[in-house]
């Protein structure tokens, strides 16, 4: 009986994943939502708001942050709607997140971090997180074919909300990509692959986090991948680039998400410079 129930539950989770994909959710979101819903049912809960609150209370006691709890609530609400339980979904309220300002790095700190890289691959990872403002998942999903050398752009596929976007990159960054690709001796379609595995699988987010932390320590900076993205936005704004352009480059659907950087930056009145200057100022100091 238990085995049959487990099989039915697995089938339901699979159907839920398909529903999320059809709703346009990113692979990352589908993975996280199905993970939490699986946990929810593993603990014997039923799809009701009351059981959802019990589940959330337990996670909070375990030390889950408000941000993490928000993600679980979004997963539960999505599942309830999938099951046609809109009234139960409405009972779950998302707590307000405190608006914290992202900590931006100085250009000198970024330079130290880039110069700390031990391989061409690692250097390029850091340069793309900073110089193109990529999310970790976007970086890991990049394929060699997504780099258009003729037009000087990369196609970022399946960003937040499952949206693709085109990001222009500088000549300096294109040269770094060419140099890195020339050093590769595998036929993986992905731009970045795991170095230590015999089979060259695409790079995992966990590896990116580990590398970023490592080079942050070497450069004497407490660092996360998202900080490099934050710094890209802040430094662009400081150089006079219009916030709507930064919004497009970051792949933000709402301008209000990007506008948080106006509170961090203090040099808005500088004359606008070409985007290429941002990366060249880092590489030029190497």
From Swiss-Prot:
Organism, scientific name? Pyrococcus abyssi (strain GE5 / Orsay)
This chain's protein is named Tyrosine recombinase XerA
The subunit field of the Swiss-Prot or TrEMBL record says:
Homodimer in the absence of DNA substrate.
Note whether Iron occurs among the keywords.
no
Keywords associated with the record: Cytoplasm, DNA integration, DNA recombination, DNA-binding
One BP term from GO: DNA transposition
Q: Which gene encodes it?
A: xerA
Which pairs are disulfide-linked? none
Q: Where is the signal peptide?
A: none
């Amino acid at each position: 009986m238990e085995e049959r129930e487990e099989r039915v539950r697995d089938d339901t989770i699979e159907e839920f994943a398909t529903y999320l994909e059809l709703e346009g959710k990113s692979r990352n979101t589908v993975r996280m939502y199905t993970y939490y819903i699986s946990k929810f049912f593993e603990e014997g809960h039923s799809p009701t708001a009351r059981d959802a609150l019990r589940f959330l209370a337990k996670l909070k006691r375990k030390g889950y942050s408000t941000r993490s709890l928000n993600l679980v609530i979004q997963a539960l609400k999505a599942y309830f709607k999938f099951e046609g339980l809109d009234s139960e979904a409405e009972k779950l309220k998302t707590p307000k997140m405190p608006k914290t300002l992202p900590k931006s790095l100085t250009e000198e700190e970024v330079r130290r971090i880039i110069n700390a890289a031990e391989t061409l691959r690692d250097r390029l990872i850091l340069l793309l997180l900073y110089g193109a403002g990529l999310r970790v998942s976007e970086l890991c999903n990049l394929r060699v074919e997504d780099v258009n050398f003729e037009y000087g752009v990369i196609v970022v596929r399946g960003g937040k909300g499952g949206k693709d976007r085109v990001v222009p990159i500088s000549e300096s960054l294109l040269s770094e990509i060419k140099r890195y690709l020339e050093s590769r001796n595998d036929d993986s379609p992905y731009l970045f692959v795991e170095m230590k595995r015999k089979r060259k699988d695409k790079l995992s987010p966990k590896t990116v986090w580990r590398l970023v932390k490592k080079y942050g320590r070497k450069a004497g900076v407490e660092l996360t991948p998202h900080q490099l993205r934050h710094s890209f936005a802040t430094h662009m704004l400081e150089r006079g680039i219009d916030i709507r352009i930064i919004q497009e480059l970051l792949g933000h659907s709402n301008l209000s998400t990007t506008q948080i950087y106006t509170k961090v930056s203090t040099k808005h009145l500088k004359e606008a410079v070409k985007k290429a200057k941002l990366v060249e100022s880092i590489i030029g100091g190497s």
